[in-house]
Each structure stands twice: as C-alpha cells, then as structure tokens.
C-alpha cells in the first residue's frame, strides 16, 4: 500500500462531493473549463480509474520478458556451435543458420532486441506509474487540508445551499487534481512516442545468397 492507497478513501469522498457540485455547472470562465474539455471526465471519476494503476504488474511483466531472453540466448548458443561437416549441403545449412542467428539476436531489430525493448518499456511504464501515483497523492493531501475542502464539505451537507462559493471551491480542487492527471497522461504519451520505434514488429531479414550446388559430396567430420 502506497501513499495514494492510504489517501484513497478520504480523497474519493471529497472528490465525489466535488463531482456533485460540478455536475450542476462550473463557474463561467473558470480555468477548469479547458481541463474538462481536454480530460472529458470529472476529478472523482478520473482518480477512481487511476487508482487501478499499479507499478508491480508492469515490473513483473518486464522480468517475465527478460526470462524469455535467456531462452533465446540458449537457442542462439546451440546454433552457434560449429558443425563438423562440409560440402554444398553444409554450406546451405551454414547460410540458413547464420540468417536465423541474425533474426534471433543481432541488433535492436532482432527478436531478442525487441524483447529487451519491451522489457525496458515495461520498466519505464512502471516508473511512470509509481511517480504519477506519488504526485497525485501529494495533490490529494494538499486539497484535503485546503480551505476549499472545508467549503465543499459545507456546501454538500444535507439541506445546504451549494451557492457560488461551493461551486468555486469545487472548481479549484478539480483544477489541482485534473492538472496533475493531465501531466501524468502527457508523460505516458511521451513514453509511447519514445519507445514506439523500438517496439515495432520485427521482420525476417533476407540475406542475399548464391545459388546452391547439388550433387556434390558432403563430408562429416568426427
């Protein structure tokens, strides 16, 4: 359990009240409006969805992919073992073996290269989630102890008249929370742009080969 989990219950209670007030309309001309148009969600609902994001599954995914890399390394080691034979068939086999080795583990466009990039992307996303959760927790801590929180609680009591003060306080809290989430999602989009070239599907890289000769002698050494 991290700081965001600990603040989830009081934070969602406050933001639920904020959502209730904003559902009746945010103050005209308030700086919240651009955020609402961009995010298309009220702060309570946005935080509730974000709470489901945790770094551990992404970290675990990175470890799992790296275990696959070790399997590819073992396969490549077997393919690289010299074969004691010669002749046209041996030459054709060596060319096919070299092409397969290139496809499996030669450079960032190989299968191993793509797996390593996938693991790195999972790690980067895990760091993003961890950092974003901490930043959001700090924002929630700030709004929970703010004067606006007191106003929102008073405006949403049974029988209370929300009034302009309640709507303004709710909008101020929403700006802080949605602003943090907007920056967080910008970070996720930046990560995707940075990693996308390294995550593209790898394709078989043909190597030009000469014509095979048939009918020659194949010699197998001991």
Where are the language model's segments positioned?
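Short, charge/polar-rich alpha-helical segments
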Residues: 55-64, 124
């Amino acid at each position: 359990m991290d700081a965001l989990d600990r603040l989830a219950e009081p934070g969602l209670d406050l933001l639920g009240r904020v959502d209730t007030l904003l559902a009746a309309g945010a103050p005209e001309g308030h700086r919240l409006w651009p955020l609402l148009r961009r995010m298309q969600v009220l702060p309570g609902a946005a935080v509730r969805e974000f709470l489901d994001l945790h770094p551990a599954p992404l970290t675990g995914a990175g470890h799992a992919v790296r275990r696959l890399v070790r399997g590819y390394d073992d396969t490549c080691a077997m393919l690289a073992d010299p074969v004691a034979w010669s002749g046209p068939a041996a030459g054709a086999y060596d060319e096919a073996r070299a092409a397969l080795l290139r496809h499996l583990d030669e450079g960032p466009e190989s299968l191993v290269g793509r797996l390593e990039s996938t693991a790195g992307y999972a790690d980067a996303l895990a760091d993003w989630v961890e950092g974003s959760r901490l930043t959001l927790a700090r924002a929630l801590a700030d709004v929970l102890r703010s004067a606006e929180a007191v106003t929102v609680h008073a405006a949403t009591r049974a029988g209370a008249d929300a009034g302009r003060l309640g709507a303004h306080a709710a909008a101020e809290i929403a700006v802080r929370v949605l602003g943090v989430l907007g920056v967080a999602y910008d970070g996720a989009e930046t990560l995707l742009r940075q990693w996308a070239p390294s995550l593209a599907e790898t394709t078989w890289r043909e190597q030009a080969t000469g014509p095979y000769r048939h009918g020659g002698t194949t010699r197998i050494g001991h």
